[in-house]
Amino acid sequence: PDVVAPGTDIVSAKSSLAPLHNFWGPYPSNSFYVFMGGTSMAAPLVSGCAALVREYYVKERKHQPSAALLKATLINGTRWLTAPDAVADHPYSPNYHQGFGCIYMPWTIPNPAEPTLKLEFQDTWKQKRLQFTRSGQRFRFQFSISGGAWLRICLAWTDLPARALQNNLNLFLQHLTSGKKWIGNENLPMGLKIPDPDNNVEVVRLENPPAGNYLIQISATNLLKGPQDFALVVTGALTSPLAVVSER
């Protein structure tokens, strides 16, 4: 999965025609509701969160978001689960049990619960100049943070339909003062620290990054067919917009 959401003992509406044994159990306070579970309960929660994210972009940012932007925003705000079954495969993000983690809206879009959370984005589905047309092409963006809070970055794109990844983009981050670098999904197992060749979502998460200016580079490592648009989301204690600084 890309994300997970609560799916155990969820209170749901009960059909008057369905026998009680089709559900997990009765809801004592109201006979029109029952307890249910599984992906049938988790999926509506994710859909509701996606609707809130879309509403945020339309109403607060005056932007019609692409599917990739909704996906990047939701994944960017996830919370990593540490229970044994959540990390049974491996304790790195992403894994086969929880993807990039559990949806957590307080970390997803600006809200009163997280007053220091700022969000900047690039959504290139209507910007031809920021769409990849060949392998080896790259775009660079710059932003600044004040420090003292976490930093999260998520890149997502809608790939061509196929059994495996077709257009491979890669995410790189650099702190301009120190020169320290990070790559997308660098916490995958085996410790290879190489660009991810398999996923159409890449994240960088820093718990206590130094203040200053940062450079993001997105590269088309392998582009079978273009143009390829993408969505980029950055959240944290941002002190500047996410500005385009290089197109090549």
Question: Whereabouts are the PLM-identified features?
Answer:
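Residue-level detector of short, conserved catalytic/binding motifs and their immediate flanks
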Residues: 1, 8, 151, 169, ...
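Acidic glycine-/aspartate-rich tracts in secreted/extracellular proteins
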Residues: 8-9, 79-82, 158, 178-179, ...
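Secreted peptidase-domain scaffold signal
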Residues: 91-167, 224-226, 231-248
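Hydrolase catalytic cores
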Residues: 3-87
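Noncatalytic accessory or regulatory domains flanking protease catalytic cores in secreted, cell-surface
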Residues: 28, 34, 90-96, 170-233
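Residues that flank catalytic or metal-binding motifs in active/ligand-binding sites
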Residues: 6, 70, 149, 167-169, ...
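Active-site-proximal structural scaffolding
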Residues: 3, 39-42, 46, 63, ...
